[in-house]
Amino acid sequence: MPNPNPTYNNYTHAVNQRIPDIPAYIQFMWGDYGSRIRLSGLLRNMTYRQYALEGMDAKNKTQMGYGLQLSGNIGLGNIVTFYYQGTYGNGITSYFQDGSGQNLDMFPKQEALNELVTPEAWGGYVGMQFNITERVFASATYSQVRVLSKDGFYQPDYYKGSQYLAVNMFCRVKSNMMFGIEYLWGKRQNMDNASNTANRIQTVARFNF
């Protein structure tokens, strides 16, 4: 059973979830080069425990989360393929790769610390792969994720968003041998708008036996 990834405080507590996340999608494909478009949806039922406060009894409370995603790729012959994905939702931050482990599916409400709210979040990427020859191809991808703080009690260093850029080139020397090089750039921004960037160059060699 999947568990939500919230930020708890002294007035809230985790409980076992009873309803799984519910996904659904529809997809359309066309052409001879694998072009497709997919619309996906997700519903989440996230339950937590409210501790007793003055005039209130302890009880379980549930927040609903949801997500919508549009994704796909467009093949232009055997040379160029474009791919894309866009996601928006409420209480789904852990479904983003950069948001996983940030404890932002829910966090305490400013006006009532024994209540959790679900922040809005959006993200997506665009990319392209270019087949230079039968053995050499290059690709580039740019992605961005953003968590929208609303009615939430959060720390200044909580995750707010990130950007990512990757550019690479690969060469298939033989059917069982491949070499590649990649440049990566990334940026993280916190809720107080403090940010930092990082750069990396990496290489890879793959041999199949």
Regions of interest found by a model, annotated:
Residues 1-52:
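Internal metal/ion-chelating core segments
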Residues 13-14, 59-60, 193:
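Alpha-helix capping and helix-loop boundary segments enriched in small/acidic/polar residues
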Residues 20-24, 66-70, 122-126, 163-167, ...:
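Hydrophobic, lipid-facing positions within transmembrane beta-strands of outer-membrane proteins
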Residues 30-159:
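Detector for outer-membrane/organellar transmembrane beta-barrel domains
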Residues 153-156, 191-195:
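Short, solvent-exposed loop/turn segments at secondary-structure boundaries
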Residues 165-182:
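C-terminal closing repeat unit and adjoining cap/tail of repeat-based domains
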Residues 171, 197-209:
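Outer-membrane beta-barrel "beta-signal"
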Residues 183-189:
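A short, acidic, flexible beta-alpha connecting loop/helix-capping segment that sits on the rim
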